Amino acid sequence: LRRLVSLTLYAHPFSSYCQKVQIAFYENAAPFTYRLLGPEDPAAMEERQALWPLGRFPVLVDDGVTVVESSIIIEHLELYHPGPVKLLPEDPKAALKVRFLDRFFDNYVMTPMQTPVFESIRPDGGRKEAMAEAAVALDTAYQWLEDHLTGPWAAGEDFTLADCAAAASLFYADWVRPIGEAFPKVRAYRARLLARPSVSRCVEEGRPYRHFFPLGAPDRD
């Protein structure tokens, strides 16, 4: 196995996908070098662009190997740097369920959550129909989750990759489209996520950047 100290993460603490990966690191207290992507460190921005010209982040470098996409980064950590908290079950069927839920949170919560954010920074102030569609999509996702949550965590009794995705997506989704009283299990699940040390650490690390949230960050969480 490669040494944990070989890990360098290019990320920003207010990014939902970066938080998703950082939660995985914090769950297993895995040491890594954090390169903040921002005007504070122009060199980090240049390095990330050279490592991954498509421009997305987070980007992980492990002993010279570049790893991209948040879910793949977490699976890479599980494969090469396993810790006491198993974020992906060894049982193939259980692992498939976790991977599905990871995709659910990224595609059906994170993506529509970002639509109003991006629309709000358009020069014309955003398209009302896009905002409305995002609200419907999030309510639909909340309802599906309300109907399928059967344990304390997304896939059941254990905290997994799916919860890393859920924490980052539901944290911001509730700012964009509040999780109403019609979804008590989802509200309680979000509260459990925010109370988990790895997640609360990410929330605190991102707090100084809340003024960047285009829709205005609520005075809570």
Language-model-detected regions and their locations in the chain:
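GST-like fold's C-terminal all-alpha helical module
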Residues: 105-197, 202-204
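Short, flexible loop/turn segments with low-complexity composition
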Residues: 90, 201-209
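Compositionally biased, intrinsically disordered low-complexity regions enriched in proline and serine
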Residues: 11, 18, 35, 143, ...
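Short, solvent-exposed turn/loop segments enriched in Gly/Ser/Thr/Pro and often Arg
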Residues: 12, 38, 161, 206-207
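Acidic/histidine-enriched, glycine/proline-rich intrinsically disordered or flexible terminal extensions
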Residues: 206-221
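Residue-level signature of transmembrane alpha-helix interfaces in integral membrane proteins
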Residues: 45, 122, 179, 212-214
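GST-like domain detector, emphasizing the conserved glutathione-binding G-site
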Residues: 2-132, 136-139, 152-154, 220
